[in-house]
């Protein structure tokens, strides 16, 4: 960050693709007036822009993620959300702060919907899960949510099959949804579901446009063209849409040459509705988003995809599903208020039109 922020005239935002790095840069970004971007991840309390004006997490947060997973089980797999009542839900989580973050919220979700939640830890790196899956076999859950990382994900699928649990009832989170998570599991991954904010495949016109204008023109540096349309490649397109449209939003107000504080305003006023996504050719790949002073996530939407091991490809398994924003807000508010108090931060007044429209905070 220190090496790059003033390079070639100065950066106007940073997206480090890391929960740890983006969180570590929160106060540095505030001091330097540098937007820190964490697409689909980051410090959940950072949703509150009145406390974290330079921190943005466009897409979904941890609580969105798990409420959407529960809504998918109810609405799609069971046919009605009311059928969550009485269900047994296990969450297999990575033994880290990231893995543990969803436990309390899952307890809240099951209290709301009348289901039973059991959290089961897998120590890092997760290449041995026999005892955890024996526990799962004994408890006989209706569904298992996989909050995994790295090798833990394919091992979970393989161990589930060995213990007789249907992988079609194993549902992965945002860090358990890539091609690299399922391909190593081989046939054991057949029927596995995972949440995504950017479905895999050539699902939108913008992908074909990139292929035509970049790769066919010999301008790309992607060595393995088979990765076009993969989960992480499409994540790059999703992030690129958010980045570019926020920059354009800032330029529409301030002119073509913008600084980092003005780009902060661009991110905070990023609006992508259906007509905007249609114009970009991104409908189906990118969810609608509406970032505001009090909501630096702005989307709270995701789809699900299911793995076809024979064809080695994902297929879309749902439409956009919204998270339980109302349920998560209390936890987010508590975390943001505590952070503000602990760090002596004066909150912005997001109801004040003049303050909300001020770019140079």
What are these regions (language model features)?
Residues 267-275, 308-361:
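Conserved C-terminal helix/tail region of periplasmic/extracytoplasmic solute-binding proteins
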């Amino acid at each position: 960050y220190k090496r790059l922020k003033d390079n070639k005239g100065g950066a106007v935002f940073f997206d480090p693709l890391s929960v740890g790095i983006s969180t570590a840069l929160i106060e540095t970004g505030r001091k330097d007036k540098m937007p820190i971007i964490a697409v689909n991840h980051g410090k959940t309390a950072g949703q509150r822009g009145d406390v974290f004006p330079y921190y943005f997490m466009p897409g979904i947060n941890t609580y969105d993620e798990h409420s959407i997973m529960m809504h998918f089980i109810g609405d799609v797999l069971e046919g009605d959300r009311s059928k969550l009542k009485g269900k047994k839900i296990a969450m297999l989580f990575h033994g880290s702060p990231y893995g543990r973050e969803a436990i309390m919220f899952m307890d809240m979700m099951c209290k709301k919907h009348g289901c039973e939640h059991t959290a089961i830890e897998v120590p890092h790196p997760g290449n041995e899960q026999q005892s955890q899956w024996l526990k799962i076999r004994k408890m006989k859950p209706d569904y298992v949510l996989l909050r995994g990382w790295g090798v833990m994900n394919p091992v979970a699928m393989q161990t589930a099959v060995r213990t007789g649990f249907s992988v079609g009832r194993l549902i992965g989170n945002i860090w358990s949804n890539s091609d690299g998570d399922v391909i190593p599991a081989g046939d054991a991954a057949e029927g596995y579901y995972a949440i995504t904010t950017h479905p895999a495949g050539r699902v939108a016109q913008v992908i074909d446009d990139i292929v035509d204008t970049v790769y066919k023109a010999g301008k790309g540096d992607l060595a393995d063209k088979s990765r076009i349309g993969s989960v992480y490649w499409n994540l790059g397109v999703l992030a690129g849409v958010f980045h570019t449209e926020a920059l354009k939003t800032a330029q529409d107000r301030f002119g073509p040459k913008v600084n980092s504080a003005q780009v902060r305003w661009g991110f905070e006023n990023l609006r992508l509705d259906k007509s905007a996504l249609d114009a970009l050719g991104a409908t189906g790949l990118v969810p609608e988003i509406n970032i505001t002073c009090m909501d630096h996530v702005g989307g709270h939407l995701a789809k699900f995809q299911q793995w076809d091991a024979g064809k080695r490809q994902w297929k879309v398994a749902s439409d956009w599903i919204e998270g339980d924003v109302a349920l998560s807000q209390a936890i987010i508010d508590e975390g943001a208020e505590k952070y503000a108090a602990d760090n002596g931060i004066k909150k912005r007044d997001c109801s004040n039109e003049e303050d909300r429209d001020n770019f140079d905070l």
